[in-house]
């Protein structure tokens, strides 16, 4: 992240050139993560996605046995979904953690902050937007699939073992994964690699200079910390219409995944008389949708790659908007259409597969929309992408934390049909944001003080 405050112009001050010891020897320097072999880079990406997946299903696994756990502790969900508070606490922490972890990863390296955040790794390994598309798509899928598959895993454990094994199994996986992460994960932050190499190769006389450089690189005041990691994302959220509306869209997409962990239990238990652990298996339909959404994202990546080619007739100034093409059907048909379908097929007289198809559509929409928003914010905001993404990330986790708390009341008081329709109408309104940007994005970016420096020049 930059050093400007949110109220300042996004012009960066000219920084002094680093000493030779803190530069790559040439563009082919083998220690530069951009030059690592593809197998090594993709190994790191695969490990990052794996960690994201297992941490994600940790958030929602408890939902698969919420009723039994509530009965054990004497917690009632009759008037309020108190059993969802563990998930709310997890997602609230996920909203706050990036503001702490990202500075650690940027200043001290990836390894110290790796167990708490992985999405920043992709930018360290892939230098251009085209090659970055696929790993980011994989990252978004691992995030969504992890939180969606949680109730399925929890339901299976509850059916065949005891609900406490939901937590025991997670401890086993985390303890088993930590040595692998510690041994396999390599540092990917270029400045940190250079600093370590300089210290390794420096003479005794040079060690003092290196220590001073290291101290300068790792120093940031609490005021600077707040400005860069809290004030600027918040400032962009309330002053940048693109960040504001895209945060709402991606937050709703993410929140719907968590709402389903509550609504599916209500719908399928009441309409079809299924036991709790069986209703949890329905969440697998959303994972199927997310996988189909990943395939659509691969096609979207192809469209961007084609537009990025030198012979393409797409103006370079319009490249960020190419990222949004598939988000239009993803939001209109996937999110809004899937919610309408899910709601208005929730009748006892209809086969259970019909509302399940609606859930699959919402999975497609969530995957396509979240990937498009992440890529657009990265490309359009360039060096301010971290702040824009932090705002969107906070919004996603806040919606995921608190929107499901209203699910029980909504689906009880409004009925299954209109509760889903309320969310569908909100999604329908927000679905126009990508259309506006596709037609007027270049003009909007010129008006924005943060986006005025185009990502592609």
At which residue positions do the language-model features occur?
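Cytosolic juxtamembrane N-terminal segment immediately preceding the first transmembrane helix
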Residues: 1-58, 62, 67, 71
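Central mid-sequence intracellular linker of multi-pass
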Residues: 2, 34-39, 123, 131, ...
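Pair of pore-lining "gating" transmembrane helices in MFS-fold secondary transporters
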Residues: 38-60, 238-259, 332, 340, ...
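C-terminal transmembrane bundle
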Residues: 56, 88-91, 95, 154-155, ...
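Membrane-interface helix caps of multi-pass secondary transporters
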Residues: 61-77, 104, 121-122, 264-272, ...
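Extracellular/periplasmic helix-loop-helix junction of adjacent transmembrane segments
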Residues: 65-95, 138
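Conserved MFS/SLC helix-loop-helix module at the cytosolic interface between two early adjacent transmembrane helices
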Residues: 95-113
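Cytoplasmic helix-loop-helix junction between adjacent transmembrane helices
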Residues: 114-143
């Amino acid at each position: 992240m930059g050093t400007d405050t949110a109220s300042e112009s996004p012009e960066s001050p000219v920084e002094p050139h680093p000493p030779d010891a803190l530069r790559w020897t040439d563009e082919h320097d083998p220690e530069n993560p951009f030059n690592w072999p593809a197998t090594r880079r993709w190994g790191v990406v695969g490990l990052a996605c794996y960690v994201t997946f297992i941490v994600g299903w940790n958030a929602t696994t408890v939902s698969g046995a919420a009723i039994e756990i509530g009965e054990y502790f004497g917690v009632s969900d009759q008037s309020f979904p108190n059993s969802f508070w563990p998930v709310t606490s997890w997602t609230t922490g996920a909203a706050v953690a990036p503001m702490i972890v990202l500075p650690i990863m940027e200043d001290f390296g990836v390894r110290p902050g790796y167990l708490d955040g992985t999405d920043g790794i992709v930018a360290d390994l892939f230098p251009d937007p085209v090659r970055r598309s696929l790993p980011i798509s994989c990252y978004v899928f691992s995030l969504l699939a992890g939180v969606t598959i949680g109730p399925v895993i929890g339901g299976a454990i509850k059916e065949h073992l005891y609900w406490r094994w939901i937590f025991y199994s997670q401890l086993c996986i985390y303890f088993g994964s930590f040595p692998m992460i510690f041994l396999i994960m390599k540092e990917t932050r270029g400045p940190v690699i250079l600093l370590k190499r300089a210290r390794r190769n420096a003479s005794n006389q040079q060690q003092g200079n290196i220590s001073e450089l290291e101290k300068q690189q790792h120093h940031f005041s609490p005021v600077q910390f707040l400005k860069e990691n809290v004030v600027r994302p918040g400032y962009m959220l309330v002053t940048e219409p693109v960040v504001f509306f895209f945060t709402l869209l991606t937050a709703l997409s993410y929140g719907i995944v968590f709402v389903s962990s509550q609504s599916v239990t209500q719908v399928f238990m009441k309409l079809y008389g299924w036991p709790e652990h069986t209703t949890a298996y329905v969440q697998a339909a959303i994972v199927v949708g997310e996988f189909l959404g990943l395939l659509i994202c691969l096609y979207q990546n192809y469209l961007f790659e084609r537009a990025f080619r030198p012979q393409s007739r797409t103006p370079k100034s319009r490249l960020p908007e190419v990222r949004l093409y598939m988000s239009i059907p993803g939001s209109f048909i996937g999110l809004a259409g899937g919610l309408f379908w899910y709601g208005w097929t929730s009748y006892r007289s209809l086969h259970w597969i019909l509302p399940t198809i609606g859930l699959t559509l919402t999975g497609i929409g969530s995957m396509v929309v979240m990937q498009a928003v992440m890529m657009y914010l990265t490309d359009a905001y360039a060096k301010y992408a971290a702040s824009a993404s932090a705002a969107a990330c906070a919004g996603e986790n806040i919606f995921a934390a608190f929107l499901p708390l209203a699910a029980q009341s909504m689906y009880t008081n409004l009925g299954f049909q209109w509760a889903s329709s309320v969310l569908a109408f909100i999604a329908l309104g927000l679905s126009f944001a990508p259309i506006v940007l596709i037609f007027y994005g270049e003009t909007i970016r010129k008006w924005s003080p943060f986006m005025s420096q185009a990502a592609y020049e």
